[in-house]
Structure formats: C-alpha cells, structure tokens
From Swiss-Prot:
Designated name of the protein: Probable U6 snRNA-associated Sm-like protein LSm4
Subcellular compartments: Nucleus
Keyword field contains Ion transport: no
Gene designation: LSM4
Organism: Fagus sylvatica (Beechnut)
MF-aspect GO terms: RNA binding
Biased amino acid composition, Basic and acidic residues: 80-91
Region of interest called Disordered, as start-end residue ranges on this chain: 80-115
The Sm domain, residue ranges: 2-75
Chain's role: Binds specifically to the 3'-terminal U-tract of U6 snRNA.
Length: 148
C-alpha cells in the first residue's frame, strides 16, 4: 500500500499529523497532493511540550515537514480492500510495461523475417571479425567510429 493512496482514501476522515518539530495537528483531511502536502479542517494544534493548544478552522501542512501520520484503522482496511479488488480485476502481467519474450497474446509482437536466432548469429560473427583486427575501413580495425 502506497502512502499517497492511503491519504487519498483518508480524505474526510480524522487524522493526527506529527511534524519533525514535535508539534501535532489533529483534524479532518480535506486534500493532499503528490508531495504529501496536507490540507486539514477543524484543526487542534498541540505544542511540542504538550502544554499549549490552538484551535484553527483549517490549516495547510507542507509534506516535507511531516514526521508521521496516524489514520483510523477503517481507512487502512478500505485501502487494502481496494488494492485487493484492483489486483483481482486485472490479469497478471497486464499494464506493467511492454514485457519481453512472449509470443502469444494480444500485445505480443510477431517475429518477422530471418528470426532472432539467425540475427544473433550474424551479430556474433560480426563481433568476432571486428575483434580479430580485420580491416574495417579508415579506422584500421582498432574500434571506434573511424573518425580522422
């Protein structure tokens, strides 16, 4: 479970945010963005010492100042159910890039022409010839692109 998916699911729920400075903020999550910046409503801020309290209608917390977040268990359960249902709907291997080496299926690329094995043999033969110092144009067979 990713932290941002957890925060997106926690919108509208109460949460506790502790900052690196030691202050804590209790409130209802309104919104969060990709940098984990958080907007809370009906906030109670507690000082680092725990002896002073402030009530605010809303507050914005920058993501890189957050030490940890405490969300209700029901939100965590809901996220786990969503990720499980998402995994059940999608067959394995779908949506994870182009993949490699599969010839069956709708997204597979069909091999045309001489085929991969023949092309590999040609490439190996070319490397062997170049490696033995055979003359290859202006460069004299010493590698490089032959400039000069």
């Amino acid at each position: 479970m990713l932290p941002l998916s957890l925060l997106k699911t926690a919108q509208g729920h109460p949460m506790l945010v502790e900052l690196k400075s030691g202050e804590t903020y209790n409130g209802h999550l309104v919104n969060c963005d990709t940098w984990m910046n958080i907007h809370l409503r009906e906030v109670i801020c507690t000082s680092k010492d725990g002896d002073r309290f402030w009530r605010m209608p809303d507050c914005y917390i920058r993501g890189n100042t957050i030490k940890y977040l405490r969300v209700p268990d029901e939100v965590i359960d809901k996220v786990q159910e969503e990720t499980k249902s998402r995994a059940d709907r999608k067959p394995p291997g779908v949506g994870r890039g182009r993949g490699r080496g599969r010839e069956e299926g709708s997204g597979a690329r069909q091999v045309r022409g001489a085929g991969r094995d023949v092309m590999m043999q040609v490439a190996k033969a070319w490397v062997e010839v170049r490696g033995r110092g055979a003359s290859a144009g202006k460069s004299g067979g010493r590698g490089g692109r032959g400039r000069g």
